Amino acid sequence: MRVTDFSFELPESLIAHYPMPERSSCRLLSLDGPTGALTHGTFTDLLDKLNPGDLLVFNNTRVIPARLFGRKASGGKIEVLVERMLDDKRILAHIRASKAPKPGAELLLGDDESINATMTARHGALFEVEFNDDRSVLDILNSIGHMPLPPYIDRPDEDADRELYQTVYSEKPGAVAAPTAGLHFDEPLLEKLRAKGVEMAFVTLHVGAGTFQPVRVDTIEDHIMHSEYAEVPQDVVDAVLATKARGNRVIAVGTTSVRSLESAAQAAKNDLIEPFFDDTQIFIYPGFQYKVVDALVTNFHLPESTLIMLVSAFAGYQHTMNAYKAAVEEKYRFFSYGDAMFITYNPQAINERVGE
């Protein structure tokens, strides 16, 4: 399969730079997986699309202010993007500098360069950095870090992004990108869903900066997926199995929830799904056999990204590309702060030929 098969024309004007004033007021494009039929509406229509007893699975990761500015003690400017927090003192990070720092290099971080850190080791493209400070890594980031807005949101981060680029149910700090499908849920909508009898469960996948890395190969099968840490606890497993047993649907909110659930299913030895606490490199593209997820809430993704490949594997390649074409024609807002889709599973997707 060629990466270019997943390309589409997107006018720059359709990239959302700010969210809607009200989280749940965005538009919703519904795609019926089996038929490819499209329905246009608003996000709160989700209430009518879900049945009592259906299970919504959210990702409760919380975005950390992961972008730091500063300089090497030797002089050159640097930009640090945290990939993950290793412990209370150390991070693994991408570092942009005219010349990469060497192990032992001293870094002065923060807009006022008040935080002292040392680059201790290099692991491929990533740098291990240790803070020489009494405070925890999280406290330091909250104090001097900037929200790591995606590269296509072409503006500096603002104070408001600390809440706007965060789901209302976020709980566990560690992501450098928001699980954006969840941004559309506000408390009133969650309350109405609960009142209808829709069940809810929470996985954790700390989204890494790798989610924005372009696919740099021509053939999809050659792509090496970045690694992210995911947790699917026992209560989620129990909820999924109970939902399936009563004939209801498991609905993933966001591709990160999909990847968490399907990783746990892949690793399971004795049941459909078992608890999972590990790094995952799961790469979902057409031909993938979904085991757990029956429906998906997701935003509109970048051309040629691994995420549009995941959606194509779920809904079918042709149905997905047709939906994106319609979304562009109807001027839906794209990417992290944009509009959403509700997609039901297409069991025929696994047999579809792509790009022919």
UniProtKB/Swiss-Prot annotation:
GO molecular function: S-adenosylmethionine:tRNA ribosyltransferase-isomerase activity
Cellular compartments per GO CC: cytoplasm
Pathway(s) the chain acts in: tRNA modification; tRNA-queuosine biosynthesis
GO terms under biological process: queuosine biosynthetic process; tRNA wobble guanine modification
Top EC group: transferase
Subunit structure: Monomer.
Similarity-based family: Belongs to the QueA family.
Protein name listed in UniProt: S-adenosylmethionine:tRNA ribosyltransferase-isomerase
Organism: Escherichia fergusonii (strain ATCC 35469 / DSM 13698 / CCUG 18766 / IAM 14443 / JCM 21226 / LMG 7866 / NBRC 102419 / NCTC 12128 / CDC 0568-73)
